[in-house]
Amino acid sequence: MHGKNITLSPVLEQLLLHYAGLSSPVNAQSRAVKLLSAQVKTISDEYLAGDSSFKGDLFRSRALRRAYSCYYLPVNLVKLLPVLDELFTHPDIKGFTEPHVSILDLGCGPGTFLLGVLEYLAAHQNLLSPDIQKIDLWGIDQVDENVTTAKKIISRYLAVQKFPSSSTWQLHFRAGSIMTAGFPHPLIPQGTQYDLIIAGNVFTEIDQESFSVLAPILEKLLSPHGTLILIDPGTRASSRRLIQLRDMLLEHTALTLYAPCLERGLCPSLDNPRDWCHQKLSWSPPAIVHVIDRHIGFTKEKGIPYSYFTFRNDGKALIHPTCDFPREKVWRVVSYQIRHKGEERLFVCNGKERKLLRRLTKNISDSNQDFSDALRGDSVAMDGMVRKEAFLDITRDSIFRILKR
């Protein structure tokens, strides 16, 4: 979704403004907006300070909860949209087709990723089969106030957003931790399985021993064709931690890695302590985010970093329907363009190997012209590179083609 104009729907943008006590158009110089901006800065400062006790305090404060929902909720929500795009690119994953659909947001906060799913489905209603009778939305969070807020915002969203009338939406929110008990879990009715589980900014905060216990529980909670998505902020430390959790899930469960890694192996980014695997999302922020950025000097409109892993319970792996190259010829771009006089370079990875590519300006051709447009996160098909000591050289005859973004 690098090249797409990712935005919030007008429905959600207005709901979040209303929840924060604001109206449209946003008055950038109003006392309420200036106060909201200061509260966003407080949230950022406390997170950067690494105070582990602050998260609970943040969501128990109504003022800070409003600031978070108005600013950080959309910033985090949009990270899910390209991940869902990538999931439903698969020709055999046709959306939600069973009569009963269940979706779980672990550590749901004020409803961030459930709202992300709803935003995506509102824009892609072909993914909702006419055979669906009921869609259960589940949110679990340790903070009571989050559960209350999520239920309020999502209920209002469903009341005003247009969805097929044949389906019934039911909301289930629970206050507690998925990590405080075994399986079956007291927060979840026995036998419940989910078609989609999303955990955002949750598991990188727990120790490896706890996650090794939790991993098999996540597997049991997934339906036979279920998807598990882990998302985190995309910092160096959190992304490297997320890779460790990826490896533990692959070790302790039968889940398979769908994306972003194209092959299963030791992540090459761990070889260098300065490296980390992350994406950067381009979007058009809502007006309130623009205004807050101007007040406090943030630049969310320039892009949002994030890291993610998508797992499947049915063995499916990411494929590109329009790609006629064998899988071993498909790689993912994992760096920005490195431009020097007379040449361009970038790194690609397939999950097991990381390669540096170089193309001299004199070697630009029809078969490799996509190289200049490649962005971090793009899947690319490549062939005919010439191995040099420190890189793979792209010749005029080499093929470098960007697949569907």
Each language-model region and where it sits:
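Class I SAM-dependent methyltransferase Rossmann-like catalytic core
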Residues: 54-91
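A short SAM/SAH-binding and catalytic strip from SAM-dependent methyltransferases
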Residues: 194-209
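S-adenosyl-L-methionine
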Residues: 148-187
